Amino acid sequence: DATRVAFVFCVGYGAVVAVDRFTGKRIWQTQFDKAAGKGFSLSGFLDRSDPSFVSGGVGIGEGLALLGTTRGDVVALSVADGTQMWRSNVGTEIGSVPTADNGRVFAQSIDGKLTALDSQTGEELWTYNSQVPRLTLRGTSSPVVANDVVYTGFASGKVTALRAENGEPIWEQRVMLPEGRSELERIVDVDSTPLIAGGALFAVAYQGRAVGMSLRDGRPRWEKDTSSFLNMAEGYGQIYIVDEEDTIVAIDQNSGEVVWQQEAFARRKL
């Protein structure tokens, strides 16, 4: 019964476990890939070159547990029993958690490509390509879907809204413009998942700023200098950002004003 599944997570190369939401007991475990003879040693676990390495985390939607690998595979497992439903290759490493909505699965790879797949068959429906700078952070933004529109961030420092049906761009908004003379100084990845709350969309860039913008056209409502590559959270009319110094910052959703900051976790790698 898929409704009893509380968590689905990867415990190694190709090994996935589902846990009962009421008892915490294991419901099922499956091995969709084998780790090239490495077993589960620490050295093997850290070897991202292994094709079975799950690089994109686990996403849940459309009755599926969705995983992305360093090989560029999107793997769909049944949430109910762990059966592999399909597997599709998008070309390069999946850098974030795949997302599913309304019969489609969306996955972003580290080459700046967003791919839409049929949730029942894994067949490719469309792709959208963004320009990737020479030097970027490892990982990518996970797509988020609302009202048949896909929103995602890219290493270019931009957030893009696309029609979920065909990948047609609706709008594009720059969160941060690259600045500085060196490639390191010019890294402005939007690696955190765009956050939708209170009828607005929020995004944050590394070495850049946080922006609250209109869902309809991407027009900025406010901007606040900060730097982060971690996912945001929201609640009580605020968004919460963990910046690159591990300071937790609460920002008012409407005004963009900082409500409070908590520096007690500095340099603790939140």
Residue ranges and their predicted role:
Residues 1-12:
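Beta-strand-rich domains and repeat architectures in extracellular enzymes and scaffolds
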Residues 6-7, 65, 105, 150, ...:
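Hydrophobic beta-strand positions that form the internal "hydrophobic ladder"
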Residues 20-23, 78-81, 118-122, 163-167, ...:
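Short loop/turn segments that connect beta-strands within beta-propeller blades
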Residues 241, 247-253, 259-270:
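C-terminal soluble interaction/assembly domains
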Residues 11-12, 69-70, 109-110, 154-155, ...:
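Structural signature of WD-repeat beta-propellers
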Residues 1, 29-59, 84-101, 124-147, ...:
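Extracytoplasmic beta-rich repeat domains
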Residues 12, 16-24, 30-32:
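Beta-propeller domains
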